[in-house]
Amino acid sequence: MIAMNRTVDLDASYTFCRQIARSRARNFYYSFLLLSRDQRNAMCAIYAFMRYCDDISEAEGASGSALERWSQDLDRALSGQYPDNPLWPAFHDTVQRYKIPCHYFHEMIDGVSGDLVPRRIQTFDELYRYCYRVASVVGLTIIHIFGFESPDALELAEKCGIAFQLTNILRDVREDSANGRVYIPAEDIAHFGADLAEHDDRFVALLSFEAQRALDYYDQSRPLLSLVAPRSRPSLWALIEIYRRLLSRIQRSNYDVLARRIRVPTWEKLAILARATFS
């Protein structure tokens, strides 16, 4: 365990987190560019923590003990004793600076721990709980960096996170199935009589139903934009718009997510940033 309290070490830690975000955060990073330097650094620190959570849970031979050690490292870092990982000083500084409730980070770890073994979600209630832990708590975390005053922002950030994760699930049907993970509720699959390995009319009807669910959560969370600090609104708008465009591309492909991974191209993300900047 090491204590990195000097300014140079904190700067190096933020640089490390920025490198992770720049290389791995395909959708998030673009929206970070619209924030102030301090906010952008904070977002990168939070993203780096999230990325490590995912990577630990998805590593070959991953085990609960690895995530338990990560949880213990988190507790030590939050007390100012930094384990031997360069992300911790920046992460701890961000949590303190923006007064982010620490329990969110343990909920993130609890969420990804469910991916250590093959899983099949049975009901939408079960799916909602999963989405809350792996996505809504992320939204609840980052609105502290955006800045807000009304407690209504918390409920809306939760709904926005649900919308994002439902979008991710639609995009990743093939990849998740190959890894033994089925997040689309079994009750919905049975209702439509669909096979997640076969792109036919029943598959399209199922994914169309799930896409409408995501759209409903996007619509319910719409007032969030007016509740975050004005300086942060362009970034949040861009992030939501990128995810909505991803969902739209999935829909316009007739849900052809088995043949390819659908993405929002870089040029379109840059156009969204330009619109957010100058509108």
What is the predicted role of each segment?
Residues M1-L166, L170, R174-S279:
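Catalytic cores of Mg2+-dependent Asp-rich isoprenoid enzymes
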